[in-house]
Regions:
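An acidic, low-aromatic, low-complexity terminal/linker signal
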Residues: 1-196
């Protein structure tokens, strides 16, 4: 099987997983949404807060504490910083700031990698910092609007406004990343013939 055929198959699996999740979500519409919560892992990219659904998270690694080396690869898109060897498994590491065209300062100081799993594929996302797990009430999550201007709405699965105080006058907007959309777009970019 050629590399391009293998990558095409992975893209198909990601799309299939996204369709299955969408179908399952449709079945839950109309249930008591007010009492349901969405468990996410919060993190920072370029001083902005984002989140990923916790069920996609395989693990969170620190390259220094876990003694992980990111090995760079020739001939790959700029956003792929390299690969890591995690207990014998080779995992690609994507710099989300470069992928989303965000400011990429302090790259040498970044040590946090969120390992996500989707459609039997594991990928690492290089992020500035990880804030931990949070529960967002489903009724408080809004569809992606223009509030988050730095990332295309195609890559967002919603926004959550976290109040800084009881008056709700200062709220932090947290963009919820659509993992399937990111991985599908990333795979499609790799399949396009271009000079890296």
């Amino acid at each position: 099987m050629t590399n391009q055929t293998h990558q095409s198959k992975k893209a198909e699996l990601i799309i299939e997983a996204a369709e299955n999740r969408a179908s399952a979500a449709q079945k839950n519409v109309g249930e008591n949404v007010g009492n349901q919560e969405r468990k996410v892992v919060r993190f920072t990219l370029s001083q902005e807060e984002y989140a990923i659904d916790a069920h996609f998270i395989h693990s969170i690694r620190d390259t220094e504490q876990d003694n992980l080396t990111i090995f760079s690869l020739p001939g790959v898109p700029e956003y792929i910083v390299g690969v890591i060897n995690l207990r014998g498994e080779i995992i690609s590491v994507i710099n989300l700031k470069v992928f989303f065209s965000l400011p990429n300062e302090n790259q040498g100081e970044i040590t946090k990698i969120i390992i996500v799993e989707c459609a039997d594929m594991r990928v690492g996302f290089l992020v500035d910092s990880v804030h931990g797990i949070a529960d967002f009430p489903l009724s408080d999550i809004q569809s992606s609007m223009s509030t988050i201007e730095k990332i295309k709405s195609d890559y967002l699965d919603g926004e959550y406004f976290q109040a800084e105080d009881s008056t709700n006058s200062n709220a932090t907007v947290i963009g919820i990343i659509d993992i399937e959309a990111v991985l599908t777009a990333e795979m499609e970019q790799r399949l396009q013939p271009s000079a890296y």
